[in-house]
């Protein structure tokens, strides 16, 4: 009998299951999932900002299968959210922006270098954002170079570098603490236990009022899981190949 069971997954667990397809506890993308229509940078930014602010971000829908004692969760709905979570967990600095640096922080930096012009805030933001974007973590970084660059940029003596390092270190350690907190954030998951053959229909119903699918995505979503077809339209074939190549390049295993 079909039914749904709620489960709680941390974002770290979700990310790990999405990217490590060799584990005994993994998530795979079904054939009916859509490839285009994936979130743009602004949608991803808004989603991560919601996590940072503790906003609800909806649920994920999985279908659980067990074969040879290996649990596999088919991702029925929530691909865009899952992909964005995986990106953030692997490289949180990708989601660090100029706006992540407060005016108060900039004011403290300027106080150290004995400047007091709010128009200089953008210099600090640009310099530190460029620095952190080159990293893939906020953890255990060395801040001598950006501190030295700030001191030189504002014509301050090198004797202020120590204070700059301390202030910058404290700031990015707070970002690491925030990352650790988000990694442990729980996202609700619904696990469906009905007939696997109904998954494309469930997917279609869930997404019928969301972002409209184009005609090729509708074709893909309508294909039965266990049936094969010969497609003579080369445009459709090329589209489908490109779609699943994109999934593979993102590290997903196609089910």
Where are these regions (language model features)?
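Basic- and aromatic-enriched surface patches that contact anionic nucleotides/nucleic acids
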Residues: 2-12, 16, 30-255
């Amino acid at each position: 009998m079909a039914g749904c069971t709620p489960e709680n997954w941390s974002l770290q667990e979700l990310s790990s299951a999405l990217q490590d397809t060799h584990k005994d506890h993994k998530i795979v993308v079904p054939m009916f999932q859509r490839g285009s229509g994936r979130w743009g940078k602004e949608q991803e930014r808004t989603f991560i900002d919601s996590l940072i602010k503790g906003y609800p971000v909806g649920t994920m829908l999985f279908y659980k299968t067990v074969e040879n004692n290996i649990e596999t969760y088919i991702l029925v709905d929530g691909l865009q959210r899952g992909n964005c979570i995986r990106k953030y967990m692997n490289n949180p600095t990708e989601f660090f922006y100029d706006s992540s640096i407060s005016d108060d922080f900039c004011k403290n930096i300027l106080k150290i270098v004995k400047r007091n012009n709010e128009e200089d805030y953008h210099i600090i933001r640009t310099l530190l954002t460029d620095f952190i974007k080159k990293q893939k973590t906020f953890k255990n970084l060395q801040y001598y170079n950006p501190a030295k660059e700030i001191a030189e940029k504002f014509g301050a003596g090198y004797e202020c570098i120590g204070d700059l390092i301390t202030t910058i270190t404290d700031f990015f350690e707070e970002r690491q603490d925030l990352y650790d907190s988000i990694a442990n954030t729980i996202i609700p998951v619904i696990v469906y236990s009905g007939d696997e053959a109904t998954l494309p229909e469930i997917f279609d119903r869930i997404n019928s009022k969301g972002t409209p699918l184009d005609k090729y995505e509708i074709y893909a979503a309508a294909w039965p899981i266990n049936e094969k077809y010969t497609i003579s339209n080369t445009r459709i074939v090329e589209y489908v190949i490109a779609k699943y190549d994109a999934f593979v390049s993102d590290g997903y295993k196609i089910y």
